Amino acid sequence: MSASPAERPAGLSVFFPAYNDSGTIASMVIRAVQCASELTSDYEIIVVNDGSVDSTPQIVDELARTYSHVRVVHHPKNRGYGGALQTGFRSATKEFIFYTDGDAQYDPAELADLWAKMTPDADLVNGYKISRSDPFHRIVIGRLYHHIVSLLFGLTVRDVDCDFRLMRRTIFEKIDLEKTSGVICLEMMKKITDAKFRIAEVPVHHYHRAYGKSQFFNFRRLGRTAIDVFKLWFALVIRREHQKAGAVTGQPHAR
């Protein structure tokens, strides 16, 4: 596929937040290189190694030596999923930014479907899972989470928490990301919605996690997430801090 948004060559940044993904990150990066090179000649692949303690750092450094379009940003210590996303958005230099996780539960080749949907009438193309290939309890918790936060935050997208997104970098001239935990996705979608950016949606496949384990689905993390969601709801829905004058800095940053 050679066509690009607005029927002209466009720059594309692809990034992966990676934490202990040594079993999957190489295949994800190689697949992303193959897909991105078919979409545009102006692309970069970025891996944000979020303080991994397995062989992820060595693997991604070798990928960067092998592929000229690949570069790596290392966090000396784990900053959390939100911290890794913030680094990825800051590091991206191209007109369009795509990200997904490094655990191979999504296929980077489906970026082509999002790219085709990125017309002049869209600012963000959000993937939504056709079906979720997870254990039953994770599916139930995921659906409950989606319905609860959609109601609390007034969101209408089909899948708030699908980390398979293509967006214009101009979005970050108007929104500022602050969260370092997994609720950064909720923060991002709420702020994008409130800033009146145009959202398109595309179905994507979700695959069984063949390597490693989720950092989200344990009771301690679920409790922490509930607290983070409440704090975010109070800040964005009750106080509407992001819509007050001077609240937008235009750069994602950690707090």
Describe the role of every protein-language-model region:
Residues I171-I175, S181-R198:
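A short, conserved alpha-helix in the catalytic core of glycosyltransferases
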Residues M1-Q34:
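N-proximal low-complexity "stem/linker" segments adjacent to membrane-targeting elements
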